[in-house]
Amino acid sequence: NSNKTPLIIRWPGVVTPGRIEDRAMVSAVDFLPTILDILSIKAPYKLDGMSYKRLLYGKKWRGPEYVYTHFTSNSGQYAEPMRCIQNHDFAYVFSPWADGEREFKSETTSGLSFKAMQRAAVSDSTLARRVHFFRYRALEEFYDLRKDPDALHNLIEDPDYAPQIAVFRKAMEQKMVESGDNALEAFRGRNDSAILQRYIAAQQTKADGYKENKRKSQNKK
């Protein structure tokens, strides 16, 4: 759901007020190509995204087959790299940090809602499993969004979905190659804990460096 964010556009004379496009998939990398296309400016180099100018004019538009999203670290610079590739029907998530011991940290875990869930989980086994999963996630996740739009049931071990999972793994690897994603080696070595631990250690070192540089910058002000 965090990736299913509405894009609201107001363009008098072009975009029909109140019009809703609920089947088109766009992402942040598509914004620049679209603006350049509207202004008839040729991109100086190959861009990752694609223009959805035709969509704004109400014309048929063949958008991307998948949307690829990623998360690197929280606001406190705690490395929690995650990658997701999805379409309208399925979503595949790769979380190299999820080793069963490293705990997910974010502002959401300190809020009233999560604390209420933790209290209720004491006497509710279903909720207890949900809380545990939220805190530790899984190395791989796969969801059938047609049947499970809230992504509550991880199907990564379900043999009935093995063909679809294979397709999405391949699609994610391709996106990683195209974008120069630094998680590519970790993804290809996802069954090797040493490779994953080395990747997370490197990402945490990078995050710590960013945090230290930010602290020094603030102290100079």
Tell where the protein language model's regions lie, with residue ranges.
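A generic secondary-structure signal for well-formed alpha-helical elements
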Residues: 12, 38-43, 56-60, 89, ...
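Single, functionally critical "micro-switch" positions that shape active/binding sites
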Residues: 5, 88, 143, 147
